[in-house]
């Protein structure tokens, strides 16, 4: 009897030992060289996790992640970490995790000042390059947590990048007019002001300061920062100036093309499709963010550490803290988040034969681990569902459903797509499906389950404070039904940023057809005149025929698409705004494209329907001359295409600047008539410009009655026609 008992105990112990050893047999390989003692892990009290590193080339992934530990000039015992490639002092580094699609680096940025005490010796520092993170392989970008902040009295702060995009704000210390509210919660223009970064996320930033009209000669500062200021907590400008820096935030990620990054990790989920678990206890996801594909890795549930180090994810002890094993058993830690209770050794009388006991225990262990695997899959699926619900609610999905159901009989006018449906339509947002990228987002070509071809626009960022306004714009744009306006078919709100679905336009944009010398399609004068008439008709509809007037705010040839018959389609309503029937203008932060921007709007920040007329006038000049709105030669002279054209009109030499491709075959009377109309659209004062309906009617008359046209080019209202120059040289 004792012999049988001993055999049974031996079998039980052997089976349990094999099960535990099997699950942990694959011991992680030794860490990569970043864990070497020659690589410093901290500098100046700041932790430097891999892929960042200090020391030899094996201590960091590549040059973009190299950190140099320098001693300060004031104290040789104090060290500070610097990012080598962009030469900025590091304040903090954090790794990506399952809740964030990218890592974060906080750095010290400069303060641009004007009229401060120390400026007298070195001259005013009213224009400083704040940051440049461009370059081949750069993983950095400015996050949308950053703001342009200006502090002082009578200050106008502007931010520019290499693509001449601009935003700015103005601060004053004058008392507000009666009825205007002053808030102490945010900087809205009293003592300080702030502006969000443009959705294009510029990578090379310069901050400029100017004295606004009537501004005092006092200290003024401007800077880019991820901190929030208000009139109640902002300090005096001199304190910012004397401090010499502010903190701003960079995001970073791993590009999918980084082959060295792939080879370093033991995580199995490194393909664009599929998922799984790895021997190194880490998982990686493929995703697409802000126009770039990236990998995001994290330790599996039950493990902790750095997933970017080989063997960096280590098992957490699940037996630590409370467990329910009781007095007759003890807790045994299992790999991952699990633990088991093992009975304390004692002599028991077996109720079943020893061999059968071993088989049952082995089968139980097998069922346990199979169940554990499916439990992990279920948890992951549930987490994705909860994230989709969270994004749907945050992005205004409930509000959109309410808006659609309140439209009498028009519920079908705009469809709400699921993220799964759009991932399937675009092959999981494959790079091969990209049609183009712009300031508002990336556009993919997709095919829905019914076989229809659509354009799927994945936005880069949406202001959460204006989500209700964004939803109202979706409902409004979905009601637009015009043959020369790209139709909005629906949207998806289950992702981090909303996705819009438009009808697919196959022949690209007007800019490429006009300026790409390799394009084999000939843009004759008849085609150009027809396109101008179609654009004018679409804008007339938006201004007056729609249920609510809509100002486009970004009319340019890259936003004019051409369908299979080369008919014009107005697109890109990312900056459009609707107004009530009795509104005459919108007061907004200055945003637009240089070369097309209304000078009156640039100075007053008040956008009217006549501002769209000015931009359309620039498009007319492009169609006539075949020249780009901005060129290197004219930029050096401080002139855009509009100024160049009006000078030619004034000197009666318009014929000299007509596009050589249409000069011989075009009807000169029609070209000159359109040129005269363009001059009216480019009038310096908005009130002297025609409205879009008048422009549309005039273009129709020019096409239908060429024999009745007056082709004289005498100067009329020369002083009124001359536009105010917008100097884009900083």
From Swiss-Prot:
The modification Phosphothreonine is found at residues 588, 593. Residues 685-730 are annotated as: Disordered. It is a single-pass type I membrane protein. One of its GO terms (biological process) is cell surface receptor signaling pathway. The modification Phosphotyrosine is found at residues 502, 601. Preferentially expressed in roots and flowers. Keywords: ATP-binding, Disulfide bond, Glycoprotein, Kinase, Membrane, Nucleotide-binding, Phosphoprotein, Serine/threonine-protein kinase, Signal, Transferase, Transmembrane, Transmembrane helix. Its main location: membrane. Its EC number is 2.7.11.-. This is Wall-associated receptor kinase-like 1. It comes from Arabidopsis thaliana. The lineage of its organism: Eukaryota, Viridiplantae, Streptophyta, Embryophyta, Tracheophyta.
């Amino acid at each position: 009897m004792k012999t049988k008992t001993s055999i049974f105990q031996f079998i039980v112990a052997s089976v349990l030992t094999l099960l535990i050893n099997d699950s942990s047999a694959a011991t992680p390989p030794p860490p990569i060289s970043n864990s070497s003692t020659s690589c410093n892990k901290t500098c100046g009290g700041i932790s430097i996790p891999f892929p960042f590193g200090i020391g030899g080339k094996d201590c960091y992934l590549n040059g973009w992640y190299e950190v140099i530990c320098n001693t300060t000039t004031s104290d040789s015992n104090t060290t500070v970490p610097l990012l080598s490639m962009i030469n900025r002092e590091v304040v903090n580094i954090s790794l990506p995790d399952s809740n964030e699609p990218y890592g974060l680096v906080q750095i010290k940025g400069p303060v641009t000042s004007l009229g401060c005490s120390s400026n007298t010796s070195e001259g005013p520092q009213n224009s400083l390059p704040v940051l440049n993170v461009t370059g081949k392989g750069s993983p950095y970008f400015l996050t949308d947590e950053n703001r342009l902040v200006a502090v002082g009295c009578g200050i106008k702060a502007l931010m520019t990048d290499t693509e001449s995009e601009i935003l700015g704000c103005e601060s004053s210390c004058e008392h507000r007019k009666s009825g205007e509210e002053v808030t102490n919660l945010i900087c809205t223009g009293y003592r300080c002001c702030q502006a969000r970064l443009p959705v294009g996320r510029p990578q090379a930033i310069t901050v400029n300061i100017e004295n606004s009209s009537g501004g005092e000669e006092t200290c003024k500062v401007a800077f880019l920062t991820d901190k929030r200021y208000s009139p109640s907590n902002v300090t005096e400008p001199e304190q910012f100036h004397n401090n010499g820096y502010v903190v701003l935030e960079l995001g970073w990620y791993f590009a999918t093309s980084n082959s060295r990054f792939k080879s370093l990790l033991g995580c199995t989920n490194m393909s664009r499709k599929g998922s799984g678990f790895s021997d190194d206890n880490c998982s990686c996801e493929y995703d697409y963010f802000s126009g770039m594909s990236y990998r995001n890795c994290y330790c599996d549930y039950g493990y902790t550490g750095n997933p970017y180090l080989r063997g960096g994810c280590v098992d957490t002890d699940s037996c630590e803290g409370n467990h329910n094993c009781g007095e007759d058993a003890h807790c045994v830690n299992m790999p991952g988040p699990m633990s088991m209770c093992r009975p304390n050794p004692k002599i028991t009388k077996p109720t079943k034969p020893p061999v059968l006991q071993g088989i049952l225990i082995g089968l139980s262990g097998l069922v346990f681990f199979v169940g554990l695997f499916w439990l992990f899959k279920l948890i992951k699926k549930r987490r994705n569902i909860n994230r989709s619900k969270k994004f749907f609610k945050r992005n205004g999905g409930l509000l959109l459903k309410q808006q659609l159901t309140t439209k009498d009989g028009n519920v079908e006018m705009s469809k709400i797509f699921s993220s799964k449906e759009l991932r399937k339509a675009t092959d999981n947002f494959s790079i091969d499906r990209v049609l183009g990228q712009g300031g508002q987002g990336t556009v993919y070509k997709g095919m829905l389950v019914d076989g229809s071809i659509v354009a799927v626009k994945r936005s880069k960022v949406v202001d959460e404070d204006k989500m209700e306004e964004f939803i109202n714009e979706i409902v409004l744009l979905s009601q637009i039904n015009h043959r020369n306006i790209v139709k909005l078919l629906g949207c998806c709100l289950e992702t981090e940023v909303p996705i819009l679905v438009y009808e697919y336009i196959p022949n690209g944009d007007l800019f490429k057809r006009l300026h790409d010398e390799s394009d084999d399609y000939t843009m004759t004068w008849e085609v150009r005149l027809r396109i101008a008439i179609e654009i004018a008709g679409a804008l007339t509809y938006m201004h007056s025929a729609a249920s609510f007037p809509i100002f486009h705010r970004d009319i340019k040839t890259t936003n004019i698409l051409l369908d299979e018959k080369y008919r014009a389609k107005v697109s890109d309503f990312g900056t459009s705004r609707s107004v009530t029937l009795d509104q005459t203008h919108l007061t907004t932060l200055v945003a637009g494209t240089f070369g097309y921007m209304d000078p009156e709007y640039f100075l007053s920040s008040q956008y009217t329907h006549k501002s769209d007329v000015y931009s359309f006038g620039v498009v007319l000049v492009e169609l006539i001359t075949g020249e780009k709105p901005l060129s290197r030669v004219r930029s050096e002279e401080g002139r855009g295409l509009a100024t160049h054209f009006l000078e030619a009109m004034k000197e009666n030499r318009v014929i000299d600047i007509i596009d050589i491709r249409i000069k011989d075959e075009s009807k000169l009377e029609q070209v000159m008539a359109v040129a005269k109309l363009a001059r009216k659209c480019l009038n310096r004062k908005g009130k002297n410009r025609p409205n879009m309906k008048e422009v549309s009617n005039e273009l129709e008359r020019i096409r239908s009655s060429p024999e009745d046209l007056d082709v004289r080019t005498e100067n009329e209202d020369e002083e009124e026609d001359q536009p105010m120059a917008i100097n884009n040289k900083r």
